[in-house]
Amino acid sequence: MAKKIAGQLKLQVSAGSATPSPPIGPALGQRGINIMEFCKAFNAQTQEMEKGSPVPVVITYYQDKSFTFVMKTPPVSYFLKKAANLKSGSKEPGKVKAGTVSRDKVREIATAKMKDLNANDVEAAMRMVEGSARSMGLEVVG
């Protein structure tokens, strides 16, 4: 018989640096999930990733207090800021440009995010990434 799902929890955790301190510890603890077990498993799986990159993770926890988790790719905004060498996007995206991103970089980001985006092909994924770039005040050139 399959385990009964008690719920799901979505977090964004820095790759390779999951610790029992807030916000991870309290979020997991109040649901009865073993915090150290999650931290060890998450850090082991994110060893190969760039340290400090934000990784969205969906944790499914069961009534017997066990859990499974699925990691997604870092957010598009993270990739765009990295490609444009920015700390943050524009404060006024429609008026003030924060920087530029080449179409090749957009294609690279779209290819990396393809499995997490709701797109059928790379061109559709590129349009989604370009929309994110515009909303951050970045100009797509090339």
Curated annotation (Swiss-Prot):
PROSITE patterns: RIBOSOMAL_L11. It comes from the Bacteria. Keywords: Methylation, Ribonucleoprotein, Ribosomal protein, RNA-binding, rRNA-binding. GO terms for molecular function: large ribosomal subunit rRNA binding; structural constituent of ribosome. InterPro entries: Ribosomal_uL11, Ribosomal_uL11_bac-typ, Ribosomal_uL11_C, Ribosomal_uL11_C_sf, Ribosomal_uL11_CS, Ribosomal_uL11_N, Ribosomal_uL11_N_sf. Gene3D superfamilies: Ribosomal protein L11, C-terminal domain (1.10.10.250), Ribosomal protein L11/L12, N-terminal domain (3.30.1550.10). One of its GO terms (cellular component) is cytosolic large ribosomal subunit. One or more lysine residues are methylated. One of its GO terms (biological process) is translation. SUPFAM superfamilies: Ribosomal L11/L12e N-terminal domain, Ribosomal protein L11, C-terminal domain. Belongs to the universal ribosomal protein uL11 family. Forms part of the ribosomal stalk which helps the ribosome interact with GTP-bound translation factors. This is Large ribosomal subunit protein uL11. It comes from Mesorhizobium japonicum (strain LMG 29417 / CECT 9101 / MAFF 303099).
